[in-house]
Amino acid sequence: TTAGTGSEVTAFSVITDHRRDYKLTVFSYELLPACAILDAELLTSAPASVAAACGIDAFIHAEEAYVSRAASPFSDAMAEKAMELLGGNIRRFVACREDIEAAENMLVGSLFAGIAFSFARLGNVHAMSHPISAYFDVPHGVANAVLLPVIAEYNALADHGRYFKIFNYISPFKVDAGEFEPGLLPGAIRELCGEIGIPNGIVEAVNNASRNGPVSRETIEEKIEAMAADAMKSGNIAVNPRASRQSDIEMLYRRAL
């Protein structure tokens, strides 16, 4: 695997149904391997865009597991170490994939994040990103990344303390608990994404992925109701730290455009 999915240690897989524009998550312990080998040398040929998309996906695995309603002391330990490794190395790794130390830290961080979300599940980011990828063929990690700023700010109202820690894992400018406010999150996340070449918003991400010419904002907006309905079918909605109805999901999509 790349330093992203953590699939080498999870019991989850995703199947894309192109006829229905739908991504289905499959869970089975039969998917767990007997042994997983992490070899950073295999990452050295990864394009920067792949390293960025997969790396931010790994960070979001840890972040969502950390704030999940199903979080536990065990998953917290895995998630915090994952965010430390991933947040501290993603810029360096994307800039130079041949940096073996950074690559190893990304791989181990991705693995810890995979263990964390196997126990604590994910949240609105992953529930909402799958429809974006299914309808518009946006890479999974990119779809997650463009949603994270608005969803993190939305969720932080329900769990201020944990998002304070998340902010310090991704931002080079650390703050004390008394200085932190949820409004700081979107800027810090977008700054990180900008540094590693991730698009800013759904419209830009969709157009970057499009193979058939420009896609208008209006075209994407027309799909929001259907995407929100699909997102609500995800079990991840139930463990998101802040309760969400379909109208909330539609609002978050619009904010993320």
Regions found by a protein language model. Name each.
Residues 173-257:
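C-terminal charged capping/lid subdomain of soluble metabolic enzymes
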Residues 65-188:
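Active-site segments that bind and position negatively charged phosphate/pyrophosphate groups
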Residues 63, 90, 253-256:
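Hydrophobic "lid"/C-terminal helical patch
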Residues 1-73, 162-165, 169:
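A glycine/threonine-rich phosphate-anchoring loop and its flanking beta-alpha core
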